[in-house]
């Protein structure tokens, strides 16, 4: 195994651990500050969102009891598109706040190259929307939340609501649009990552870099494939509101990636909140503003107005 592959393996583990710590910290910081769920949640595990599909094309759904027409938050895991699992996404805190929570797996880059990942995410959204009545979900209040590679995919969900190319397979009569996007430090423009990395940060120009593995070729040699995978390519004024959170000393995904996304969203007139975690790396945030801003964001955009 060469040095670059060893480093990528380390990166995947670092991504998963730091993202998990960040999510766990956010949930611990807000848990118990609202009314408790009367009973344990209703849990559906490993629902196949593609009939007879890949083993990764499954999701878990958590529903608080005694609720109807629930707003839904869909959690999408990170892991450099090479690793990670839905089991690393904790649903409990937002169940207490009156949300349904789904967490999805998707095909990784070793299973299929891009656009398989966004196709899977959209298939999961369509499955949940097509079955909204069955699960007491409000089909008009779907939010998505992800970090790192998951941040990239939720940003793509937000900016490609009007792009039919990525909607393939089943439940095509319903939309894959979402109504709110919480993007934690997701890549947004692969070809600008190297120039803005921190000293000693990850090498994004290697043919073995996660971004190259995602598109199935060296990113420098495939600008058209890169553009197709970049969330900023598709931004239009009708995109949903975004919350972007990023540490300013992230060694894996440069902070500049979120600066680019914020600027492009603002230019298009899309509502966006961008919060920089001072001294923050690739997740693992203990800044109390992170869970506060995230909860306020979803409350504003997914909870029914009185």
What is each residue range found by the language model?
Residues 34-37, 52, 192-234, 240, ...:
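Mobile cap/lid helix-loop segments that gate and shape the active-site cleft of serine hydrolases
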Residues 126-197:
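Primarily recognizes the serine-hydrolase "nucleophile elbow" in alpha/beta-hydrolase
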Residues 69-80:
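Short beta-strand element of the alpha/beta-hydrolase
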Residues 238, 243-246, 250:
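Short beta-strand/loop motif that positions the catalytic acidic residue
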Residues 112-133:
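Alpha/beta-hydrolase active-site loop
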Residues 109-111, 277-284:
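Histidine-bearing beta->alpha loop at or near hydrolase active sites
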């Amino acid at each position: 195994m060469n040095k670059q592959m060893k480093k990528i393996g380390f990166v995947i583990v670092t991504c998963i651990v730091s993202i998990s710590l960040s999510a766990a910290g956010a949930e611990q910081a807000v848990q118990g500050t609202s009314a408790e769920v009367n009973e344990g949640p209703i849990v559906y595990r490993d629902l196949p969102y593609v009939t007879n599909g890949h083993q990764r094309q499954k999701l878990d759904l958590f529903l608080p009891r005694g609720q109807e027409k629930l707003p839904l938050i869909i959690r999408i895991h990170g892991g450099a598109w090479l690793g990670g699992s839905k089991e690393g996404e904790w649903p409990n805190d937002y169940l207490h706040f009156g949300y349904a929570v789904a967490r999805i797996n998707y095909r990784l880059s070793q299973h299929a190259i891009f656009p398989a990942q966004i196709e899977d995410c959209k298939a999961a959204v369509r499955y949940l929307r097509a079955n909204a009545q069955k699960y007491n979900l409000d089909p008009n209040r779907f939010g998505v939340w992800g970090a790192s590679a998951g941040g990239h995919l939720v940003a793509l969900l937000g900016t490609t609501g009007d792009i039919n190319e990525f909607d393939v397979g089943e439940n095509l009569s319903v939309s894959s649009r979402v109504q709110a996007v919480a993007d934690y430090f997701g890549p947004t423009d692969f070809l600008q990552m190297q120039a803005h990395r921190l000293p000693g940060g990850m090498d994004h120009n290697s043919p073995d870099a996660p971004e190259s593995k995602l598109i199935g070729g060296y990113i420098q040699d495939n600008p058209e494939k890169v553009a197709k995978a970049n969330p900023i390519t598709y931004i239009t004024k009708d995109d949903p509101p975004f919350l972007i959170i990023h540490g300013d000393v992230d060694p894996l995904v440069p902070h500049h990636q979120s600066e680019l996304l914020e600027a492009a969203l603002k230019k298009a007139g899309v509502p966006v909140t961008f919060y920089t975690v001072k001294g923050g790396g690739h997740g693992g945030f203990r800044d109390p503003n992170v869970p506060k801003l995230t909860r306020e964001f979803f409350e504003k955009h997914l909870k029914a107005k009185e």
